[in-house]
């Protein structure tokens, strides 16, 4: 309802003020909300939207392409929040070893939205051997930014194993990254990120 929306906005603005975070309300009366989101993203550090609303409430006729469009046009990082609030204490970082995946870690560490969290960096592999220093380097980078971190190598596909692994390890947030190349992003989003968004009951931090 409109009343509920106004209360939520007021509470959000009050919380931002308490944390000394700049917050302003912008209203756009137009049929294409994505045009407004893309425009405003140029001058903001983080974009937040409901994890399921983009799929469940007719926000767009093609959610898959909409999320791809947001990320390829520069709306990132994105925090996709779940329906139910949960304190963020344990963060699971899905790390592929790619430059894009490393950038996602860097964006999260630099933004530092939850300073007291512990980090769990996981790499999913499908039989191939990875460099032994892959997770070691990622862990050292996180530790250099003052975070407590542990690492784990898991056999299997990220698409089918990421969410079960996150739940088993009591993660409160998942950090993921993808390439900005549109063709590659469409393939990767279809394989992992979109599948995760559609199925997740955890908030997601999505970055380049």
Residue ranges and their predicted role:
Residues 14-15, 80, 107-111, 141, ...:
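A generic secondary-structure signal
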Residues 62-66, 134, 188-193:
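Charged helix-capping and loop-helix junction motifs
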